[in-house]
């Protein structure tokens, strides 16, 4: 994305932009963007996968390996002002095998006052929503809805996600 595209997005009514791949080429993009639109309007996504005992960062929809360890990337990101961090476990994404609580805890301990949203593997039959509500500010779900495991209405009623 470039600033012209971002300007068009915000002029069209958006209040937040989601950034991932671009940061691997220009991490200072966050500062440039924040100076114009404010940190609260930035949502940073980290796509990660466990590889040889460590979590590593990926980009381009989880297809490109960055060779950057997750913990190193989190340390760098803590120097920037953005409102939300989305962590995606790409090995669990679309698998419905449950969220990765170990990964959530690892990230939660290392981010400075950012809203944390998790994506990857949610299954309403096995995940304890009360634990997730304590650890997360948001949860991204898709396949469980697509496969009709539940509806958003049922999710809302059953789990009362509102904090």
Predicted ranges, named:
Residues 5, 29, 73, 99-103, ...:
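General structural feature for long, well-ordered alpha-helical segments within catalytic domains
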Residues 29-37, 129-163:
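C-terminal helical cap(s) of enzyme catalytic domains, especially alpha/beta-barrels
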Residues 1-13, 102-141:
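Catalytic cores of alpha/beta
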Residues 4-93:
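Conserved anion-binding
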Residues 64-71, 97-106, 156-157:
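Charged helix-capping and loop-helix junction motifs
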Residues 24, 121-123, 146:
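Short, surface-exposed acidic/glycine-rich loop or hinge patches that mediate macromolecular interfaces
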Residues 2, 52, 92-97, 124-125, ...:
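Short, small-residue-enriched loops and turns at beta-alpha junctions
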Residues 29-48, 97-124:
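Alpha-helix-loop-beta-strand connector modules within alpha/beta enzyme cores
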